[in-house]
């Protein structure tokens, strides 16, 4: 975004931000107000950056560039968009590092931009789309009120909570995007968790709220003796069945539409990945109690979540916590807060290990 804001030019921004007691042309240090203002301006530009990535994804521009560089006019013809504004969008995307502007309106994908293709492992296209879709975007408009009131204002933004919104037939496409985004984002985390988790003595696994089943299916691929199941809302389970069939695992897999607050199938192992952060403590206890009531003797649960670390240390979990406040009743938690939830639900944390991307696996045993 430096082409637009000029924020890399410290003396240039001094005309905008002002420099108390400093004449034009005077050298300034990074701690002086102009540089600080530039850093803040770039943070505020995150709103624009998210929309640029969302538009790239929706217009399939990275897919159109998959085979090599094209002009903005060629991309516009394929995308069905206006040539001049497509050029402006692609120019902005190049400032964000998503595209490489080669001159003469010609662009190619960068390594970052490749992640917005629809056909690559770990694709973030669905995430770019869902983050800029109404269910997320409208909720952020009420964020300050959420801070004032102490709880999400999603009902004010959407007329209902986020998961009710996704369950409505008219929002099925957005709900499917959300499920796909969660599955795509879990790739590295899933690999780390599968590598760290022992399935000795485990025959049956239930992926609680598992969307398209990426986690349990990866575990089944690693252990051919396992039978797996996904429990999720109706809009997600069809995708789980399709994914199991694609991987050749349908004979050991089933998907059940249900409500994890009410009842879960019996199993030796429950996978509860990035579920608890969507809910308040009482709701988390209810989910885990459902698992505790149904677990087979000697069974376990694996919870995978971000864990808030030491205060004052840069921590993605604390930023993600703001998204939880904006859109859900949930929160990111530290280990002490997790342990309180586990204990109240009849579990004890027996192991904790990093699984990638700032996420941790927390193995639970029934007590």
Predicted segments — roles?
Residues 4-16:
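Short hydrophobic transmembrane-like helices used for membrane targeting/insertion
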Residues 2-4, 19-103, 199-200, 204-367:
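Alpha-helical subdomain
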